[in-house]
């Protein structure tokens, strides 16, 4: 397996793309509320990316995907297609966006709540976020991919939730989905060794119920088999000389 090590110049372009992707989610947050459709949210994101940022929405037409964002509500695990479906009070939704700037991709997703939701849903969102952070904190040269997956799995399952195993993070740069695959489960000290200059996403999907998922007939939407809630967070990460840099960090976010 060949994994690209980014040059200093490439790393700087990744920082710019990552910041732009993060800014899309900063912008869309105030629009997530009961009554809005995911199609409307998608159109707002597209308008912002194309006309304000002057960047390229990577998802549009990617392998036939019809939207700018993936919008995954409640029991939808990932890759939800924007539609006329309107959010209801208490819905939780993941918005996943990728932009291309100067040929480089920035990829990130966050959880949002429409109105007020249950304590159980809030805990799922929080535990999923912290599991991502645990995985990110395992990133440094000399550590291995299995250390990332193990940290995520240990935290999520330690809180009695389950980790989706069918979908994973990925290398990223000029190629959207590149090597290596970043599994969100695994054993410590296994897999590829991390090296300075690698860039990849960490994006765990965590379910309130069982880990089982199924793909709907549209070929994109993935849902929990038991119809339980699912949450996901995602950041793009750079391996630095002594640890990591989060390229898609939100304002006031610290990992």
Language model regions located:
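Active-site neighborhoods and metal-handling regions in enzymes and metal-associated proteins
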Residues: 1-255
